Amino acid sequence: MPVRVHNFLGKLGWNARKYLPWLASESYLKLQFVTRRKLQRNYIEYFMSAKEVPQPLVVNLETINRCNSTCEFCTANKYAEKRPYMRMEDELFYQIIDQLSEWGYKGHLTMYGNNEPLLDTRIVEFHKYAREKLPEAFIFMSTNGLLLTVEKVKEIIPYVDQLVINNYCMDMKLHKNIQKIYKYILEHPEEFKDVDVLIQMRYLKEVLTNRAGSAPNKPATDKVIKETCLMPYTDMWIMPNGKLGICCCDNFEVTDLADLHEVSL
């Protein structure tokens, strides 16, 4: 099927996230810890035994650091944003993609971070270039869908393997523009045979993690979580200013690992 609509645990899950947010949040975290432990052990063994440092599983390439949504769990929502405005230079973007191409990169690539990628007017052209240079990479776009139209979807799908539309709402209903897109895809499946379109029903006021103490709707805690986080080893996090960050939860971009103006990937 060219389009799927996913709502975690259906109406039961939605009501839990809406009416029992802290319980839902903590339960989800515990589930993640349980399901990921074996995968983490396997990855650590793989990473430590590799003759060369493995390529990242995911490259997150944020080209603009702004969002147009109001998700209460995120510091990038338009009412909570504190970061200085940044937009990646064209030259730097193309250099990064060229370096990934020289690397023979075949992992996942997304031009998404703590932002809405469609706010960058160059985003379709950027995806086109990435597709040409990285034919074996899995390129996906994650968007809140607020700026999406049928025409915009048709522009982007030739260059992505997956389009993820996060439908953030209060009523468990698709936004009107997303309804039109969903209907169009169902009526024209042949146009979408080479792309996976996933629409995720998301609660706008959901409580997730505390994002290393920065989440607007979940304060920091002194509780020590004795779990391993592998994101600095599995994900490459590139910000619009060319800095390589430690991970997506460093929302205010406090920790820099490198500057891609000075070093290569």
Model-derived regions, located:
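Conserved alpha-helical substructure of the radical SAM core
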Residues: P2-Q162, H175
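Conserved AdoMet/S-adenosylmethionine-binding subsite of the radical SAM
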Residues: D120-Y233, M239
